[in-house]
Amino acid sequence: MIMSKSTSAPIGIRSLGVSFPQVIRTNDYWQQKYPEMVRSSPQRNRSNRAVRSSHEDNGYDLWSQEVAPYLSDPFRGNVERRVLGLDESSLDLQCQAATEALLAAKLDVEEIDVAIVASLFADNLGMDNTTLLAQKLGLNCPAWNLESTCSSALVALQNARALIQTEEYQNALVIVAHFGSNTVREKDTLAWSMGDGAGALIVDRLKPNQGVLANKIVSTAATYGAYHHQLELDEVGKPRIVTQTGENASSLAETAVDFVRTCCQEAAVKAGVSLAEIDFWVFNTPTPWYANVCTRALDIEPERTINLYSHYGNIGAVFPLANLYHAAKEKKIAENSLVLVYTNGASATAAATIMRWGDVALGTAPAPSISDRPTTIELQEIKPRDDTEQKLSLPKILAAPPEQQQQVLASYLITWLANSLQLLPHEIEPELPLIMWLDSLMAFSLKSRIETDLEISIPIKNFLGENNLTDLTQLILDRITLSNLAIVPSVNSHEISERETDRETMSL
């Protein structure tokens, strides 16, 4: 049931500016500097299978179907990323984005009532640079930091709107930045995805019926541990934060569909509109396939959204602003378009904001992509999972004759891989390194599945590197054997204790 439409004051985005580093780093950088990182991938001739509706898929199935086409690419769909050059600073980039938004709105810094800043991984370690930013811009108004990982932009917009709604302030400058390239080791494949950028917007009163209509924000605490951050010294002895894939990375895949459906559907109810009425959708895209997952989860047409991942890589909290900017620049949205923006911030919040787009002024366009990739997403053909997928449990393995246990276990693993990669079982070659089949998220998903089904713990390192399916099968079998042996003494001790008690009773 659709509720009545929002009657709140028309407050939303008045102007929008973005800023990106001058350096556009392509895959050639790693191919030339670290050729050993770039592996040739096995040939994967996909079988033709019948298409089925996305409504029959659970969240992980849908995710794995969209990941699968990228696994044959050594760079997993990464094409370009903008990274800070030696003569650039994170502060400069933020100032440029803010200046673009101010100029587009034809406002002076003295006219800004409040500034809200969300800066992820800026130059100054351990502290945000809001004060330095306000000082460099010449702001005299209150300014503070707000952070909710990749949902920071929408959370900041929600806060700015609320402050203006209560008439505490007349307008707000929101500045959002992400400098992921600073936090990853170049020889870590996670570096292939990390980009840098900044965006800014002026939040103000708009024409009647325009602006933000509703928000829905939920906790993503279930994804805590998806990324691991640690402090280390760089090559010149300067401390820095290093980001790596965490032990709970599989939760990103397992929860993605539920979060996007919950936020978008409930935001629509609050706004008094249906999802079918949305003219254009904007998703944050931390992976090449993320927009596809969201589009399929909500059953919307691909031409009603945009995917800039191939242009920017993962720019975190900046994505909603960059996507809105490019969508407006490319005339995909216009004044009075009904727009839904969705973001998912790991270990923080997922958020959906529905707005009636106003006459938004845009700052100077960033340098164009050099890869000439389309921004309209292309959905992969949905292929059904094998209905004969093997269900395995610890008792089932132990019930099999010892000489057949390894074969039973290998069949279980091959079936999981075949279904996840949309291959036929005979296409899975057990002697190839697992890294040829799995990206990091799928490796954690397989780890989680094994530990749930078989009640044993397997270190993540055994799913990566040069380990192959045969190695993994033998390791799991060894763990099961040890686990079973550990149970036997406790049972025997209990039986012995009962016998001793019987003897004592008889002797008495």
What are these language model-derived features?
Residues 14-17, 147, 172-178, 203, ...:
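Short beta-strand segments
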Residues 66, 70, 82-148, 267-291:
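Conserved beta-ketoacyl condensing-enzyme motif
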Residues 387-508:
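Phosphopantetheine-dependent thiolation modules in NRPS/PKS and related acyl-activating systems
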